[in-house]
Amino acid sequence: MLQKRKINLFLFAAFILLAESVFISCAKKTEEKKAIQEDFSEFEFNGKKLHGKKIQPDYATQFCIYEYEDGFSLIDICGKEKYLIVPEEKYSEGLTCAADGIIKRGMENIYLASSSAYSLWDALGASGKLGFSSIKENDWYIPSASDAMKSGKMLYAGKYRMPDYELLLKSGCKLAIESTMILHVPKVKEKLEQLGIGVFTDYSSYENNPLGRLEWIKVYGEISGCQEAAFSFFNSQANLLKNIIFDSKEIRSSYFYINTRGMAVVRSPDNYVSNMLKCAGSDYLCPKIKNDTDLASRPTLSVSMEEFYKSSKTADFLFYDGNIDPSCTSLAMLKEKNPLLAEFTAVKNGKVWCAKKLIYQDTAEICQIILDMNKIFSAADDKEIFFFERLK
């Protein structure tokens, strides 16, 4: 009897340690930056020195914010770019400073070419300030964005690589929010700036911690003038992760899709999606990367089916990326992609889930997505799962 009690105590202790380690891996606050940042507690603007304090993000590694007197603030994108945010009543054309851009707080008619940012603006109640979109109505999976396009409140203004300059100019657009894809077409950025349209580059895709991605809502809180709402929303969402239920047994999962060449495309070990699964209480399985920092930094890895089978055949759960490959809607269709998939434990046990298209656009719901993953691991009713569908 005593021996049995000792074993139970050992298992309980191991479970507590597992739960703590998984939660810490998700909720670990930012301790190191990827680049040494210059301090901008003092900043010269229009011939005047601004003095303020640095607001360090809790989880994000790609930005920090400086708050100055008189409502001014500076967004430092990890030493890459700096944007001075100027209160509306103090803004005028011709202002000068050492920042890469000067943005009037609360401006409207913004051209959004970073679709993952829309839900953050929406969560702030500020999506009405977004006048233009780089994707068409049918490509939006967030209902409010689709409705805004349908009603004409938000207009299609061309893709990031070929914006409708004439429409933007005619409509008085003064700011474009771009994803890092704009870095591949520098002439477009240059042209926008020549036309008097400032360009703000969103580097949230460089964040590996899912809470780091969500924390970019603080950046858009500064730009929109909804700072308090941004901090409140972020804190309320981060607190949701306290509701995660950890299973006492080890859970293993993998996230993938099969490309047109028949290769398995998996999320790299430290990608934000992989880390979401870890936050939800799972070990993440994928092929090992042998001392290749370039491969490790990529969001996805393309591997042979044999390699994928070797690394993930024992996964308790498989997540299929239906956003990239929407053609897979049943277990039978999954098995048709490669006979090896029929041998996976998760396939045999009917524990394969397909991610809905909404998942990559709805950044504001990252914590809800993690909770969905945790519900899947905890054998919750399928009806309780919103962002994934079980393949049958």
Residue ranges and their predicted role:
Residues 240, 244-329:
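Flexible, glycine-rich surface segments
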Residues 108, 115-121, 133-144, 184-187, ...:
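Extracytoplasmic ligand-binding site segments that recognize negatively charged/polar headgroups
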